[in-house]
Structure formats: structure tokens, C-alpha cells
């Protein structure tokens, strides 16, 4: 029993250790991309191309519609941002069944939508992405409140405000795309004074903040792009294994408890020394059967547990009279 318990404890420790290692690995591999401020002053939207990103599975991206306050410059821009297919992105059109990711219609607060690039979403309405596949985000609004619900054209056509997300792909394979558009860590452009060009034009950025586009550690991103899916598979396997172990332990405990209830606590045998003196007639000459009186209660008083509990409620003890053939064991004595 002690050995089995120690084995179970070791299995639990191994599973928890494996889960912790996988969690740390997944967290260390995931990157929070530089946020995208959705407005016409964002110079990252290149004419005829838009904004090209190379996110990996596990990364996160924030799309923000900045608010208007006392420090802002210009007017608030109203947009509805959609995720569409390639044909819609090329023609700058949306369909009625498309659901907006962002509804930028609150000038007094930031409106943000966070995209988590994951292959499997725990949310029913969550976004799911596949490696080596392209995804598109556009807006057909024109920036004014009256043109908020436009279904074609808009800033997608006039200002190339659209995002191409090449999930799980390497920016180096796209030739000079790294020099003309942002990747996982967009490089700083000339003339930004050390600030990222995706900074909102309405909010003054912190002068001390800067983004390094040459951070190390991104060369092996495509080799381990599916570590989150691997982590999810191993984690689910460990959880199923733990549930099976718990179920088996519970069933074993129930079986033992039931077995204890139905099995006798002691193996008792009738002692012939407790038998009453047999009745014998004067003319049987050892040929007639003897009347042996066997008490229901044995010497150790555990032969009938139920009788022990309730016998006092029913009066005198009850005896069973059994007919037995004549015998002469060593511990039975006859009256002469």
C-alpha cells in the first residue's frame, strides 16, 4: 500500500513538473507585438500595400482606436474594422454577415481589440489561425460618423488602411519585405525621432520609450512555431491521465468498502465444548440419534452479529436443535 501511494505521488509530481516546464516554455516563446493604432495618420500603412505582419503562433497583437482628450490633435476618426478574405481585401468590400472586430465610435476612451494567434481557441467565438496562411483586416469606413457603416471603398481604398497577417511565416523568405514593412518587431523608420511610427497621433508618446527592431532570439521562431499546440496536446493528455488515476482510486476505495461490509469480520467455528449435554434414553444402546442442543451464540459471541444487537429485545436466547447421528468425539461426554 505504501509503495503504491509513493508511486502515485511520483506520477503526480512528474505531471505537474512537466506542465510547469511547458507553461514556461510557451510563455517565453510568445511575443506581444507592437500595437497598431487604427487611424489615417499611421505611416505604417504603405500606399498600395497596407501593413504587413509576420506573427507566429502564440503571439498577441492589439489594434487600438485612440481616444480624444485635451492633449489630442485633430478630430476623432470613426471606423469599423473587419477580418475578411483575400478577395474582399483586394476589392475593399465587406459583406453583411461580416462581424466587426472593432467599432471605433467612442471618442472619450480607447477602443482595443486583442488578437491572440492560436490554432485552437477555448472561446466559441474566438479567432483561430493556421500556420502558413494569410489573414486580412480592413476598414471600409471613411473616418466620419456618417460613413461609419460603408460597405465598400473607404480608407481601405483611399489610404490603404488594411493589414496582411502572414501567420507562421518567416519574413526573410519574403525578400525585402523586412525593409519595406514591419514584421514581428517593426523596425524604426527614419524621421520618427526614435519613436515607433504606429504611435497614435492623438496621444503624445513617452519620449523615453523606443522599440528595438533588431532584438535577438527570433531566428528560431519558425522552428518552434507550433509549441503552443504541442503544449495543449501534452497538457490535455496529462489531465486525462490524472482523471483516469483519480477514477481508478475512487473505484478501488468503493470496492474495498463494499467488500468489508459483506465479508465476515472473523472466521468462527463452533466449539463442541459449548454444546449442551445430549439427551439419551435408557434403551437406545448407542443406536438411536442423539438430541444435541447447539446454542445460536458461540463462545466468542461473534457468530451472529445481528443477534448480538437485538437479542436482548426479544427475551430469552433462542437455541437451534439439530438432529445428529450418534458419535463419540473426545470432548463430548455422556451420562452413565
Curated annotation (Swiss-Prot):
Location of the region described as Disordered in the Swiss-Prot/TrEMBL record: 170-216
Residues bearing glycans: 39, 142
Residues that bear Omega-N-methylarginine: 280
Membrane-spanning residues: 233-253
Family: Belongs to the ephrin family.
Subunit structure: Interacts with PDZRN3. Binds to the ephrin receptor EPHA3, EPHA4 and EPHB4.
Protein name, UniProt field: Ephrin-B2
Organism: Mus musculus (Mouse)
Amino acid at each position: 500500500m505504501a509503495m503504491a501511494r509513493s508511486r502515485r505521488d511520483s506520477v503526480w509530481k512528474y505531471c505537474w513538473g512537466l506542465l510547469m516546464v511547458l507553461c514556461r516554455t510557451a510563455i517565453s516563446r510568445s511575443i506581444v507585438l507592437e500595437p497598431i493604432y487604427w487611424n489615417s495618420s499611421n505611416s505604417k500603412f504603405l500606399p498600395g500595400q497596407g501593413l504587413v505582419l509576420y506573427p507566429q503562433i502564440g503571439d498577441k497583437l492589439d489594434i487600438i482606436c485612440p481616444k480624444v482628450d485635451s492633449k489630442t490633435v485633430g478630430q476623432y476618426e470613426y471606423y469599423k474594422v473587419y477580418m475578411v478574405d483575400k478577395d474582399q481585401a483586394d476589392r475593399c468590400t465587406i459583406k453583411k454577415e461580416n462581424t466587426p472586430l472593432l467599432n471605433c465610435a467612442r471618442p472619450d476612451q480607447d477602443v482595443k481589440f486583442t488578437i491572440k494567434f492560436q490554432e485552437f481557441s477555448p472561446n466559441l467565438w474566438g479567432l483561430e489561425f493556421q500556420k502558413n496562411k494569410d489573414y486580412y483586416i480592413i476598414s471600409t469606413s471613411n473616418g466620419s460618423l456618417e460613413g461609419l457603416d460603408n460597405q465598400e471603398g473607404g480608407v481601405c481604398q483611399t489610404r490603404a488602411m488594411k493589414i496582411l497577417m502572414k501567420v507562421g511565416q518567416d519574413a526573410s523568405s519574403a525578400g525585402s519585405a523586412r525593409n519595406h514593412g514591419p514584421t514581428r518587431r517593426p523596425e524604426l523608420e527614419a524621421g520618427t525621432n526614435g519613436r515607433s511610427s504606429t504611435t497614435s497621433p492623438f496621444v503624445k508618446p513617452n519620449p523615453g520609450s523606443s522599440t528595438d527592431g533588431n532584438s535577438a532570439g527570433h531566428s528560431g521562431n519558425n522552428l518552434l512555431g507550433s509549441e503552443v499546440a504541442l503544449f495543449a496536446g501534452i497538457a490535455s493528455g496529462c489531465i486525462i491521465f490524472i482523471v483516469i488515476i483519480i477514477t481508478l482510486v475512487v473505484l478501488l476505495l468503493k470496492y474495498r468498502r463494499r467488500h468489508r461490509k459483506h465479508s465476515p469480520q472473523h472466521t468462527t467455528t463452533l466449539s463442541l465444548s459449548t454444546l449442551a449435554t445430549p439427551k439419551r434414553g435408557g434403551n437406545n444402546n448407542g443406536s438411536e440419534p442423539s438430541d444435541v442442543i447447539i446454542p445460536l451464540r458461540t463462545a466468542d459471541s461473534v457468530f451472529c452479529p445481528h443477534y448480538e444487537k437485538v437479542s436482548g429485545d426479544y427475551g430469552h436466547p433462542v437455541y437451534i436443535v439439530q438432529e445428529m447421528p450418534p458419535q463419540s468425539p473426545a470432548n463430548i461426554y455422556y451420562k452413565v
